[in-house]
């Protein structure tokens, strides 16, 4: 690695952000399977996109069709999956985007490792805290049924632990309230930390 030197671009993150009229950030949605991470992140992205913001959503299932298609579900492979996603998200934030990611990411160590790659304020942890009982009742992919039968090893929440965040920037239980109000809570937070400029709020009403 001693012969590999980081090449400084002539256009930096601040310049890209000014062009887009937004402050780049990574929102990291974490929670159990079926908690509503992808649904919530997708609804927020739609709202921001329709207001003219430049966004991208990284989804746990989608990245395994390409970027991480060579990885399985062992502990080592899951760690590598999140490492890759964290690096891609970092590049996207550097490009000036508002990036949303929806991954179970069950351990605090994994999430803290990704947070450490970003400057203060550019990593926002959103704990989608929907209870296991609700997630299992929803079971949109039938994974909990398989896990209860022992057909899926190391399934988070059943045969493998989920470590809830200790100090997430936001905590949302999707079993309480409706999707629109949950999205507005996220938008209010992004406004408060100046990711969203006040002169563009009208289009989010």
From Swiss-Prot:
EC supergroup of this enzyme: transferase
One example GO MF annotation: ATP binding
Catalytic residues (positions): 105
Keyword field: ATP-binding, Kinase, Nucleotide-binding, Phosphoprotein, Transferase
GO BP annotations listed: hydrogen sulfide biosynthetic process; sulfate assimilation
Record's keyword annotation contains Signal: no
Function as written in the Swiss-Prot or TrEMBL entry: Catalyzes the synthesis of activated sulfate.
PANTHER family the record matches: ADENYLYL-SULFATE KINASE 1, CHLOROPLASTIC, BIFUNCTIONAL 3'-PHOSPHOADENOSINE 5'-PHOSPHOSULFATE SYNTHASE
Name of the protein in its database record: Adenylyl-sulfate kinase
